[in-house]
Amino acid sequence: MSNSYLSFFVLSSILVLTLIFFFMKRKKTKFNLPPGSMGLPFIGETFGYLKPCSATTMGAYMENRIARYGTIYKTKLFGEDTIVSADAELNRLIFQNHGKLFDTNYPKSIAEILGKWSILTIVGDVHRELRNVSLNFMSYARLKTHFLKDSENSALLVLNSWKENCTIEAQSEAKKFTFNVITKQIMSLDPRNPETEELRDEYLSFMNGVVSAPFNLPGTPYRKALKSRKIILKFIEGKMEERIKRNQEGKKDLEENDDLLNWVLKHTNLSTDQILDLVLGMVFGGYETSSAATALAMYFLPGCPKAIQQLREEHQAIARSKKKAGEVELTWDDYKKMEFTHCVVNETLRLGNVVRFVHRKSIKDVRFKGYDIPCGWNVMPVISAVHLNPSNFEDPQHFNPWRWQSGNWASLNSNFMPFGGGAKICPGMELAKLEVAVFIHHIILKYNWDLVDVDDKPIIHPLVDFPKGLRIRVQRQPTLI
């Protein structure tokens, strides 16, 4: 009898497992996935995808896949099944449906470096709270006053240190410029203080590992980034403790009282770990993209003398107007007058692609143009592929700021997504544009410059980088105001 029951149980189990396998297979095969190749086991095509390439091209990998499969294809990246989108319409759908159809999904290795509470990787209610803090911090009211003033002061500090006919590593100077702005606003750091320079050095090591291969081995960029993270957090925590102590003692500093660190300590219930990850991430986000865009502007402009001439005329007119009015510092009205400068900034962001792609995942089954994106799959909107598609931008690899003049703006705007889009659009977008414009204002009035190494082209690695540091030779611009 027992043998009969045992046989019945075994046969029933086999039948159930067969049915489960059959229905799972049916469910799996019902999707009409985009074409593509899943590459090698586990790693897929990650190394090909991340292979360094020119920042002003899609790169050989993307060009090859688009030629073979079209602008939407499947692959495996970072160990996950992934739909890659070089399609502007799908990218807009992804950005505009955050939390409805798609959500943030950065690789575990990136989350480990940026932290559990990073605004970039976290989702849900805590993300909304942290994002509201960052949006309030980078509000238009602060841009018009605090950030504009510090951007100008930092630009002048950097540019006034240059000597006639000297060679400058422009990439390093751009990083110094934007780092000083963001750390002044977040922690009231003095750009002349050695501790600010030491912190910037740690951030350089940190950034190199954020998007590196996640090999936690001695000497790897990933291991160095984890080490730098600890040092940076220790520095920030030290500043927090100093601030808390001074607040308790009733000692107030007008500058410190208005920075981000003081605000979150006084007006939020965030934990120490949440504040540490927030500050770490906001310095990273407010520094890297802005510095890359500033360096790219210095790279593109010498190849376009007509743009330099038009910029010079625009900024000389602003300077003459200020001199006549007895004003010295730039105002928000001055910034709004920089119409052609805004065209140059947009074109720099489009062609330079400071943000190449973002990480998302589908939280529902999505059907688009006949293809299925299964729930749970990673989705990778590739921004650079949209910006460099001739269907979206005429002669896309040509630096042409005039394409952004008012008559053309509306037709280009829907395909322009340098900072992502939707609810997760970069909170520092307007700050980055402001910083580049202010830097252009002063460098155009003070200097002529040319590239020392014409072969030192920007590459994506996957952050924007100049292998030789973008060396430029500067000459003083005669004062014509």
Swiss-Prot record:
Gene Ontology MF terms: heme binding; iron ion binding; monooxygenase activity; oxidoreductase activity, acting on paired donors, with incorporation or reduction of molecular oxygen
Identify the tissues in which this protein is expressed: Mainly expressed in leaves and seed pods and, at low levels, in flowers and stems.
Instruction: Answer whether the UniProt record assigns the keyword Metal-binding to this protein.
Output: yes
Biotech use, per record? The coexpression of CYP90B50 and CYP82J17 in the yeast strain RH6829, which was engineered to accumulate cholesterol, leads to the production of diosgenin, the main precursor for the industrial production of steroid hormones.
Instruction: Identify the SUPFAM superfamilies for this entry.
Output: Cytochrome P450
Q: Where in the cell is it found?
A: Membrane
Q: What is its EC number?
A: 1.14.14.-
Q: What class of enzyme is it?
A: oxidoreductase
The question of whether Metal-binding is a record keyword is answered with yes
From what superkingdom does this record's organism come?
A: Eukaryota
Ordered alphabetically, the record's keywords are: Cholesterol metabolism, Heme, Iron, Lipid biosynthesis, Lipid metabolism, Membrane, Metal-binding, Monooxygenase, Oxidoreductase, Steroid biosynthesis, Steroid metabolism, Sterol metabolism, Transmembrane, Transmembrane helix
Q: Which GO terms describe its biological process?
A: brassinosteroid biosynthetic process; brassinosteroid homeostasis; cholesterol metabolic process; saponin biosynthetic process; steroid biosynthetic process
Q: How does it sit in the membrane?
A: Single-pass membrane protein
- Please give the GO cellular component terms listed in this UniProt entry: membrane
Instruction: Supply the Gene3D superfamilies for this chain.
Output: Cytochrome P450 (1.10.630.10)
Q: Which PROSITE patterns match?
A: CYTOCHROME_P450
> Which residue ranges run through the membrane?
4-24
State the pathway, as annotated in the record: Steroid metabolism; cholesterol metabolism
CDD domains per the UniProt record, alphabetical: CYP90-like (cd11043)
Primary location recorded for the protein, binned into one broad class:
membrane
Q: What does this chain do? A: Involved in the biosynthesis of spiroketal steroid and saponin natural products from cholesterol such as diosgenin and analogs (e.g. furostanol and spirostanol), plant defense compounds used as main precursors for the industrial production of steroid hormones. During the 5,6-spiroketalization of cholesterol, catalyzes the hydroxylation of cholesterol to form 16S,22S-dihydroxycholesterol and, possibly, the subsequent conversion of 16S,22S-dihydroxycholesterol into 16-oxo-22-hydroxy-cholesterol and 16-hydroxy-22-oxo-cholesterol.
PANTHER family annotated for this entry? CYTOCHROME P450 26, STEROID (22S)-HYDROXYLASE
User: What protein is this chain from?
Assistant: Cholesterol 16,22-dihydroxylase CYP90G4
